[in-house]
C-alpha cells in the first residue's frame, strides 16, 4: 500500500539524515573547532567544505568548491593547477578528505585528523588538516 511505502521512505530518509548529521559533527564540526583553537589567526586555509569552518572559525578561507572563491572554478578538477593556485594564493593549510584530492594530499604533512570511528564505518577516510608548503 501507499502508506507503507511512505513510511518506508520516511524511515530510510530519517536514517540517512541521522548518518549525515553524525558525519558532519564528527568530521567537519570537529575539524573546524580544532582549527579555531589550534591554528594561528593569520593563516590562510584552503578547504573543500567550508560550512563548519565558516561557522565555528574566523580564518581567511580559500573555498576549493568555488562558492566564496569563484576564481578557483576554472581549475577545480585539475589538482596540478589547484596546487599552483594554492601556491599563488600562499595558502598555509589544506583541509580535505584525502580521497577528494589524492595528488594534493600525497606526501603532505598531516597536522590533524579526526580519527572518527563513525566515518570509518561508512568505509570513508577521516578529514585531515595538512600543512601546505608554499614555495
Protein language model features and the residues they cover:
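Low-complexity, intrinsically disordered Gly/Pro/Thr-rich segments
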Residues: 107-119
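Membrane-interfacial entry segments at the cytosolic side of transmembrane helices
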Residues: 1-2
